[in-house]
Amino acid sequence: MIKDKKIFDISKIFDAYSENNKATIVAFGSSVVERTIEGMHWFDCLEIALNWNRGRIHQCINSGHSGDNSRDLLTRFDRDVAPLKPNITFIKIGGNDTKPDINMSRSEFKSNMKKLVRKLKDIESEICQMTYHSPISKLYGKQRVEKLSEFMESIREVASSEGTYLIDDLPNWEILREKYPKVHKSLIHDEIHLSKLGNIFLGLSLIKTLNLNMGERDQAYWSKAMRIHTLLHSDTTKSK
Protein backbone atom coordinates (compact mmCIF):
# COMPACT_ATOMS: atom_id res chain seq x y z
CA MET A 1 0.00 0.00 0.00
CA ILE A 2 1.36 3.41 -0.99
CA LYS A 3 0.05 6.61 0.47
CA ASP A 4 2.16 9.63 -0.44
CA LYS A 5 1.10 11.34 -3.67
CA LYS A 6 4.70 11.41 -4.89
CA ILE A 7 4.65 7.62 -4.88
CA PHE A 8 2.29 7.35 -7.81
CA ASP A 9 5.24 7.80 -10.20
CA ILE A 10 7.71 5.73 -8.19
CA SER A 11 8.22 3.36 -11.14
CA LYS A 12 9.91 6.26 -12.95
CA ILE A 13 12.61 6.53 -10.29
CA PHE A 14 15.03 4.56 -12.49
CA ASP A 15 14.32 6.36 -15.77
CA ALA A 16 17.31 8.70 -15.57
CA TYR A 17 19.82 5.83 -15.43
CA SER A 18 21.51 3.68 -18.06
CA GLU A 19 24.47 1.33 -18.37
CA ASN A 20 26.60 4.41 -18.99
CA ASN A 21 25.03 6.37 -16.13
CA LYS A 22 24.48 3.86 -13.34
CA ALA A 23 22.44 4.43 -10.22
CA THR A 24 24.00 3.68 -6.85
CA ILE A 25 21.20 2.21 -4.73
CA VAL A 26 21.68 1.76 -0.98
CA ALA A 27 19.56 -0.15 1.52
CA PHE A 28 20.03 1.42 4.96
CA GLY A 29 18.73 -0.02 8.20
CA SER A 30 19.07 -2.76 10.80
CA SER A 31 19.00 -6.57 10.67
CA VAL A 32 15.86 -6.55 8.51
CA VAL A 33 18.04 -4.90 5.87
CA GLU A 34 21.30 -6.73 6.55
CA ARG A 35 22.09 -9.73 4.33
CA THR A 36 21.61 -13.06 6.15
CA ILE A 37 22.13 -16.77 5.56
CA GLU A 38 18.50 -17.52 4.63
CA GLY A 39 19.14 -17.10 0.91
CA MET A 40 17.59 -14.65 -1.53
CA HIS A 41 17.17 -11.32 0.27
CA TRP A 42 14.47 -8.78 -0.55
CA PHE A 43 17.12 -6.30 -1.73
CA ASP A 44 18.61 -8.99 -3.99
CA CYS A 45 15.16 -9.33 -5.58
CA LEU A 46 15.25 -5.65 -6.49
CA GLU A 47 18.75 -5.90 -7.93
CA ILE A 48 17.86 -8.92 -10.08
CA ALA A 49 14.53 -7.51 -11.24
CA LEU A 50 16.18 -4.27 -12.29
CA ASN A 51 18.67 -6.23 -14.35
CA TRP A 52 15.85 -8.21 -16.00
CA ASN A 53 13.84 -5.09 -16.82
CA ARG A 54 16.35 -2.31 -17.35
CA GLY A 55 19.74 -3.96 -17.79
CA ARG A 56 22.74 -3.34 -15.56
CA ILE A 57 21.90 0.30 -14.88
CA HIS A 58 22.66 0.04 -11.17
CA GLN A 59 24.85 -1.12 -8.37
CA CYS A 60 23.15 -2.13 -5.12
CA ILE A 61 24.91 -1.74 -1.78
CA ASN A 62 23.53 -3.21 1.44
CA SER A 63 24.27 -1.01 4.45
CA GLY A 64 22.16 -2.89 6.98
CA HIS A 65 23.57 -3.44 10.46
CA SER A 66 22.02 -5.80 12.98
CA GLY A 67 20.87 -4.16 16.20
CA ASP A 68 20.66 -0.63 14.85
CA ASN A 69 17.96 1.84 15.78
CA SER A 70 17.29 5.27 14.29
CA ARG A 71 19.90 6.87 16.56
CA ASP A 72 22.51 4.46 15.23
CA LEU A 73 21.64 5.28 11.63
CA LEU A 74 22.25 8.95 12.34
CA THR A 75 25.56 8.12 14.04
CA ARG A 76 26.95 6.07 11.16
CA PHE A 77 25.42 7.99 8.26
CA ASP A 78 28.51 10.08 7.49
CA ARG A 79 30.74 7.01 7.56
CA ASP A 80 28.59 4.37 5.87
CA VAL A 81 26.22 6.19 3.51
CA ALA A 82 27.40 9.69 2.61
CA PRO A 83 30.68 8.52 0.98
CA LEU A 84 28.69 6.23 -1.33
CA LYS A 85 26.74 9.21 -2.73
CA PRO A 86 23.66 7.07 -3.37
CA ASN A 87 21.26 8.15 -6.05
CA ILE A 88 18.47 6.19 -4.36
CA THR A 89 18.27 5.09 -0.72
CA PHE A 90 15.80 2.63 0.80
CA ILE A 91 15.40 3.02 4.59
CA LYS A 92 13.82 0.36 6.77
CA ILE A 93 14.16 0.94 10.51
CA GLY A 94 12.08 0.97 13.68
CA GLY A 95 12.04 -2.50 15.19
CA ASN A 96 14.95 -2.00 17.56
CA ASP A 97 13.60 1.43 18.47
CA THR A 98 10.74 -0.36 20.25
CA LYS A 99 13.01 -2.16 22.72
CA PRO A 100 12.19 -1.09 26.31
CA ASP A 101 15.83 -0.44 27.23
CA ILE A 102 16.22 1.96 24.28
CA ASN A 103 13.60 4.29 25.79
CA MET A 104 12.72 5.79 22.41
CA SER A 105 9.73 8.12 22.35
CA ARG A 106 7.59 8.55 19.27
CA SER A 107 8.60 12.20 19.02
CA GLU A 108 12.30 11.31 19.08
CA PHE A 109 11.82 8.58 16.49
CA LYS A 110 9.99 11.00 14.19
CA SER A 111 12.71 13.61 14.71
CA ASN A 112 15.41 11.06 13.89
CA MET A 113 13.64 10.08 10.68
CA LYS A 114 13.36 13.73 9.65
CA LYS A 115 17.08 14.20 10.28
CA LEU A 116 17.92 11.13 8.20
CA VAL A 117 15.75 12.34 5.36
CA ARG A 118 17.37 15.78 5.41
CA LYS A 119 20.85 14.25 5.46
CA LEU A 120 19.94 12.23 2.38
CA LYS A 121 18.49 15.30 0.68
CA ASP A 122 21.76 17.12 1.39
CA ILE A 123 23.62 14.52 -0.67
CA GLU A 124 20.89 14.63 -3.35
CA SER A 125 19.63 11.10 -2.86
CA GLU A 126 16.10 10.04 -3.74
CA ILE A 127 14.54 8.53 -0.61
CA CYS A 128 12.25 5.52 -0.30
CA GLN A 129 11.05 5.05 3.27
CA MET A 130 9.66 1.59 4.00
CA THR A 131 7.30 0.54 6.75
CA TYR A 132 7.92 -2.72 8.60
CA HIS A 133 6.42 -6.14 8.18
CA SER A 134 4.27 -7.50 11.03
CA PRO A 135 6.06 -9.41 13.80
CA ILE A 136 4.77 -12.52 15.55
CA SER A 137 2.75 -10.75 18.25
CA LYS A 138 3.01 -13.40 20.97
CA LEU A 139 6.80 -13.44 20.68
CA TYR A 140 7.37 -9.74 20.05
CA GLY A 141 5.11 -8.56 22.86
CA LYS A 142 1.97 -6.45 22.82
CA GLN A 143 3.67 -3.21 23.87
CA ARG A 144 6.37 -3.50 21.21
CA VAL A 145 3.80 -4.32 18.52
CA GLU A 146 1.79 -1.22 19.47
CA LYS A 147 4.90 0.95 19.55
CA LEU A 148 6.05 -0.36 16.18
CA SER A 149 2.66 0.58 14.70
CA GLU A 150 3.00 4.10 16.12
CA PHE A 151 6.51 4.47 14.74
CA MET A 152 5.39 3.33 11.30
CA GLU A 153 2.68 6.00 11.38
CA SER A 154 5.46 8.50 12.10
CA ILE A 155 7.29 7.27 9.00
CA ARG A 156 4.15 7.91 6.95
CA GLU A 157 3.93 11.41 8.41
CA VAL A 158 7.58 12.15 7.63
CA ALA A 159 7.21 10.83 4.08
CA SER A 160 4.26 13.16 3.58
CA SER A 161 5.80 16.25 5.20
CA GLU A 162 9.23 15.80 3.60
CA GLY A 163 8.00 14.68 0.18
CA THR A 164 9.80 11.33 0.06
CA TYR A 165 8.67 8.09 -1.48
CA LEU A 166 6.81 5.74 0.86
CA ILE A 167 6.55 1.99 0.43
CA ASP A 168 3.89 1.12 2.98
CA ASP A 169 3.72 -2.68 3.24
CA LEU A 170 2.61 -2.91 6.87
CA PRO A 171 -1.18 -2.88 6.19
CA ASN A 172 -0.79 -5.86 3.86
CA TRP A 173 1.28 -7.76 6.40
CA GLU A 174 -1.37 -7.02 9.02
CA ILE A 175 -3.97 -8.69 6.81
CA LEU A 176 -1.77 -11.78 6.62
CA ARG A 177 -1.19 -11.75 10.38
CA GLU A 178 -4.86 -11.38 11.26
CA LYS A 179 -6.57 -13.48 8.56
CA TYR A 180 -3.89 -15.96 7.50
CA PRO A 181 -1.73 -16.56 10.59
CA LYS A 182 -0.17 -19.78 9.26
CA VAL A 183 0.91 -18.02 6.09
CA HIS A 184 2.21 -15.09 8.10
CA LYS A 185 4.18 -17.38 10.40
CA SER A 186 5.81 -19.06 7.38
CA LEU A 187 7.29 -15.68 6.42
CA ILE A 188 8.96 -15.05 9.80
CA HIS A 189 11.60 -17.33 11.30
CA ASP A 190 11.60 -15.93 14.86
CA GLU A 191 9.68 -13.00 16.31
CA ILE A 192 10.47 -10.44 13.58
CA HIS A 193 13.15 -11.54 11.11
CA LEU A 194 12.15 -12.76 7.68
CA SER A 195 12.53 -16.35 6.57
CA LYS A 196 13.78 -17.16 3.07
CA LEU A 197 10.16 -17.18 1.86
CA GLY A 198 9.50 -13.93 3.74
CA ASN A 199 12.40 -12.22 1.99
CA ILE A 200 11.23 -13.46 -1.40
CA PHE A 201 7.67 -12.32 -0.68
CA LEU A 202 8.82 -8.86 0.46
CA GLY A 203 11.08 -8.62 -2.59
CA LEU A 204 8.22 -9.63 -4.87
CA SER A 205 5.95 -7.00 -3.30
CA LEU A 206 8.68 -4.38 -3.76
CA ILE A 207 9.35 -5.11 -7.42
CA LYS A 208 5.64 -5.10 -8.20
CA THR A 209 5.31 -1.72 -6.47
CA LEU A 210 8.15 -0.49 -8.67
CA ASN A 211 6.39 -1.88 -11.77
CA LEU A 212 9.17 -4.36 -12.50
CA ASN A 213 8.55 -7.85 -13.84
CA MET A 214 9.94 -11.25 -12.92
CA GLY A 215 12.05 -13.18 -15.40
CA GLU A 216 9.96 -15.81 -17.20
CA ARG A 217 12.55 -18.54 -16.66
CA ASP A 218 12.46 -18.00 -12.89
CA GLN A 219 8.69 -18.21 -12.38
CA ALA A 220 8.97 -21.49 -10.46
CA TYR A 221 11.32 -19.89 -7.94
CA TRP A 222 8.77 -17.19 -7.16
CA SER A 223 5.72 -19.47 -7.18
CA LYS A 224 5.14 -19.77 -3.40
CA ALA A 225 5.55 -16.04 -2.85
CA MET A 226 3.32 -15.36 -5.85
CA ARG A 227 0.54 -17.51 -4.40
CA ILE A 228 0.69 -15.51 -1.15
CA HIS A 229 0.68 -12.25 -3.10
CA THR A 230 -2.37 -13.40 -5.07
CA LEU A 231 -4.14 -14.54 -1.88
CA LEU A 232 -3.47 -11.20 -0.21
CA HIS A 233 -4.58 -9.06 -3.10
CA SER A 234 -7.68 -11.11 -3.86
CA ASP A 235 -8.60 -10.56 -0.21
CA THR A 236 -8.05 -6.80 -0.38
CA THR A 237 -10.10 -6.63 -3.59
CA LYS A 238 -13.02 -8.44 -1.95
CA SER A 239 -12.94 -6.08 1.04
CA LYS A 240 -13.35 -2.97 -1.11
Label the predicted regions.
Residues 1-66, 71, 76-85:
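Serine-esterase "nucleophile elbow" of acetyl-processing enzymes
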Residues 45-52, 56, 69-240:
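Alpha-helical cap/lid subdomain in secreted, periplasmic
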